[in-house]
């Protein structure tokens, strides 16, 4: 299945998934395409963060749906 991920800049990234894939796998694919480490990624659907440990099925992700990618930046002084 194909799921779309939209960044804060408005860029839309399509990722191909299997129902048994973990949500974390989406972050790995985004790292390959965009160079953003998974530890800095948060995937949001309907205003809630999706747990990395869930499978695509358990997270209720379906073909064509759109997730939002939010980056968490490490704070400094």
Curated annotation (Swiss-Prot):
GO terms for biological process: modification-dependent protein catabolic process; protein neddylation; regulation of proteolysis. It comes from the Eukaryota. The keyword Amino-acid biosynthesis does not apply. SMART domains: UBQ (SM00213). One of its GO terms (cellular component) is nucleus. There is a cross-link at residue 76 (Glycyl lysine isopeptide (Gly-Lys) (interchain with K-? in acceptor proteins)). Disulfide bonds: none annotated. Residues 1-74 form the Ubiquitin-like domain. The keyword Zinc-finger does not apply. CDD domains: Ubl_NEDD8. SUPFAM superfamilies: Ubiquitin-like. Residues 77 form a propeptide. GO terms for molecular function: protein tag activity; ubiquitin protein ligase binding. Keywords: Isopeptide bond, Ubl conjugation pathway. PANTHER family: UBIQUITIN (PTHR10666). Present with 1310 molecules/cell in log phase SD medium. Ubiquitin-like protein modifier that can be covalently attached to lysine residues of target proteins. Activated by the dimeric UBA3-ULA1 E1 enzyme and conjugated by the E2 UBC12 to substrate proteins. RUB1-conjugated (neddylated) substrate proteins include the cullins CDC53, RTT101 and CUL3, and the modification enhances the ubiquitin-ligase activity of the corresponding cullin-RING-based E3 ubiquitin-protein ligase complexes (CRLs). Interacts with CDC53 and DCN1. This is NEDD8-like protein RUB1. The lineage of its organism: Eukaryota, Fungi, Dikarya, Ascomycota, Saccharomycotina. The gene is RUB1.
């Amino acid at each position: 299945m194909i799921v779309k991920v939209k960044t804060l800049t408005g860029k839309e990234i399509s990722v191909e998934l299997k129902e048994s894939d973990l949500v974390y796998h989406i972050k790995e694919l985004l790292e390959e395409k965009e160079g953003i480490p998974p530890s800095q990624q948060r995937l949001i659907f309907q205003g809630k963060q999706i747990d990395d440990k869930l499978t695509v099925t358990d997270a209720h992700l379906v073909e064509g749906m759109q997730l939002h990618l939010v980056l968490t930046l490490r704070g400094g002084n």
